[in-house]
């Protein structure tokens, strides 16, 4: 029953976020999230190195938005093409739903309504070949399995 309630909750959140899908996807916009082992979202790990590499190779070609727990921490790093936004705010949802590519290193919120014309790249923090992830877990609940079917 608990997993069914989570599933209904996720569907309600998807409906609430739907208006953001009315905005066009920006081909030059990249959104990044870096999960840091229970400490929140940070400018770190594999997504950070991809972000830095893209900025180095394609200077001023892309708008790069990082969804982080504390954007004030990165004020000194912000530039014309690099921005930090507080994660799980309306502003972060806007950038996530209008980016052509989203790069993350962990399982993103299962209720998040990514769009069909977006690319979601997951670098799987710490590798994945030796870890149980998502549906591979023996205790994967109903909501997790239902999301994987999508």
Predicted features by range, described:
Residues 30-150:
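Active-site and donor-binding regions of nucleotide-sugar-utilizing enzymes
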């Amino acid at each position: 029953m608990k997993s069914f309630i989570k599933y209904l909750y996720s569907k309600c959140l998807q409906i609430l976020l739907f208006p953001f899908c009315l905005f066009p996807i920006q081909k030059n916009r990249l959104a990044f999230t870096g999960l840091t082992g229970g400490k929140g979202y940070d400018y770190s790990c594999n997504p950070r190195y991809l972000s830095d590499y893209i900025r180095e190779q394609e200077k001023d070609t892309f708008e790069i938005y990082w969804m982080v727990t504390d954007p004030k921490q990165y004020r000194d790093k912000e530039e014309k093409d690099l921005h930090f936004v507080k994660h799980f705010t309306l502003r972060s949802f806007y950038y996530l739903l209008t980016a052509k590519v989203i790069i993350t290193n962990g399982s993103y919120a299962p209720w998040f309504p990514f769009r069909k014309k977006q690319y979601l790249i997951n670098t799987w923090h710490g590798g994945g070949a030796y870890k149980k992830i998502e549906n591979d877990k023996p205790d994967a609940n109903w909501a997790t399995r239902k999301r994987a079917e999508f």
